[in-house]
Amino acid sequence: MARSIKKGPFVDDHLAKKVAAEGTGSKKVLKTWSRRSTITPDFIGLTFAVHNGKKFIPVFVTENMVGHKLGEFAPTRTFYGHAADKKSKLKKK
């Protein structure tokens, strides 16, 4: 279910303070563990280092990302492809 409009978008307080102190268009990368924070229009032009559980993934925020969560742009799982079918390998030989 979507968040109520009267509540507004959720942004962690510590992240909002970092963004306000940094200013728009800064080259400095803002390191954050807050994957749950919603991207607001003041984030446009900033680069965040979003933690994916193992390392920090750089995410440059554009206009199209507004309204999404930071965690959507830092995948936590690595897909190596589906396992090969043993029967089809034996049949080909």
From Swiss-Prot:
Pfam assignment, any one: Ribosomal_S19
Domain of life, per lineage: Bacteria
Any GO BP: ribosomal small subunit assembly
Keywords, in A-Z order: Ribonucleoprotein, Ribosomal protein, RNA-binding, rRNA-binding
Record GO cellular component, one term: small ribosomal subunit
GO-annotated molecular function: rRNA binding; structural constituent of ribosome
Family: Belongs to the universal ribosomal protein uS19 family.
Job of this protein: Protein S19 forms a complex with S13 that binds strongly to the 16S ribosomal RNA.
Name the UniProt record assigns to this protein: Small ribosomal subunit protein uS19
Biological classification of the source: Bacteria, Pseudomonadati, Thermodesulfobacteriota, Desulfuromonadia, Geobacterales
